[in-house]
Each structure stands twice: as C-alpha cells, then as structure tokens.
Amino acid sequence: MFSKTILSLIASAMLFTGSVAAAEPVRIIFETDMGNDVDDVLALDMLYKYQDAGKIQLLLISNNKGNAYSAPFIHLMNDFYGWSGIPVASSPAELLPRQKEKQPSYVEAVAASGVFPASSAETFDSVEKYRQVLAAQPDRSVVIVSVGLLSNLKRLLDSAPDRYSELPGRELVARKVRLLTMMGGSFDGQRRREFNIRIDIPAARAVFGRWPTDILVSPWEVGGQIFYRCAALDKIGYAAQHPLKMAYASYLPMPYDRECWDQTAVMAGVE
C-alpha cells in the first residue's frame, strides 16, 4: 500500500521561510510545458541558478508541450546557461493534448531567430528517460517539479518494466521519488478552470488518484500574487542577447509585469 499527502502551499507558507540547507544537492526533474506561458522560462532560469549554487542536481528536463520548437528552445537554454549536459526529453506530439498556439510562440521566436546557436543534442522520449534517470537514483531521493500538464506523469505511472528497471511505473515512482511539487489547480472558491489541469483532465485525475508519494500543490492564486517586474528584466545586461529577455519580449508587448506561477513550485521543490 502507498500512502500520500496532498498539501497546498496556501496551507504551508512556512516552507518558504527558515528552511535548513540540505546536506547534499536536491535531485530535481523539471516537468514543463515550455511554449505555453512564459513563466516556464524564468522557472528554468531559477533552476540553473540553483544548480550554479550547488543547491540542486538537475537530472532531467521533460517537456509536455506539443510544439516542435519547445525542445530546441530548452536545448538552447541549456547551452546558454552552460549546462548542455542536462538531458532533455519530450513526448510525441500525438500523445499530448492538442492546444491552441499563439503564433508565433515565444519558443519559436527565440529558437528560430538565428541569434543563438542551434543545439545538436538529442531529445529523448520522456517516459523512457524518466525510467532511466529514476532507476539510477537512490531510493526516495528525487523531487519532481511539474509546472505544466500532467500528461507525461500519467504515462510514467502507466509504464511497463523495461531494461532500466523491473518495476512498473507506479512502483518505480514510489521507490525513487520523494516528493512531487506542482503548479496547478485553484482552491480559492472562484471555480477557476486552471490551465494545467483542464487541458488534460484524465491525466490530472490519474496523477492525483494514483501518485504514490506526497504532492505539494502551488495553486493559481499563490503565483498570481507574485510578479516578475519588467524593470528586473531590463537590468539583465551581462549578455548582449539573452534568451530569457527575448522570450518575455516575444510573449507579450513590452513593458509588462508577469505572474510567477511556476516559480513558486520550483521554490517549494528546492527550498
């Protein structure tokens, strides 16, 4: 039998204060829908900074957005931030929910701009790479930070034993994962149909119903009160061209301040 707790950050704000430094870097897998809202880019920027500081080991970046430019954009970010060795994975577009696309998406605007070198790194299948990475980790050591759809996590739960592990997906997760933090849902009584849940409701039901570890949820109303200011973006001046700045400028007409939904899930998973 598996037991789990599902906790909202609304009821656990103490996680953001007085945290004790971990004895070793937190092992993180980042699950993103890169190409939808632009806050995924800043969330990934945070993870690179945590890795620079030795606070995390970023094991895998897994994408659940069916945009042909999403994975190239993530590879580009890896290269720009000096972490080209971090594996990138994605599910085939036909296995992901169809979504309306903002044309052009910021991932296309940046990746196809020619400003940044294209990467030749391989993009792996998300579930296969999840299984490979998880199987190699110590038991109960991995924190998955999910800031997009739950499609890949459902596929992971449903996965069969393979060359990496004799365990089926749910049992592999139970053995290797310590915590799932996610941005998703809304619990303020406004009956808000939050994007990460409503776009793939069967996956959300499967994850909330069958996930075998504790889940910490940062809902819409938490990140909706925190803003990344345009003034902070303007102060990034250490590179003549920066993919973070270009992504924000491509997403909406500048200047604008943007909510920090995904960043709260990252902070909860690390801190």
Regions found by a protein language model. Give the residues of each.
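Bacterial N-terminal signal peptides
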Residues: 8-17
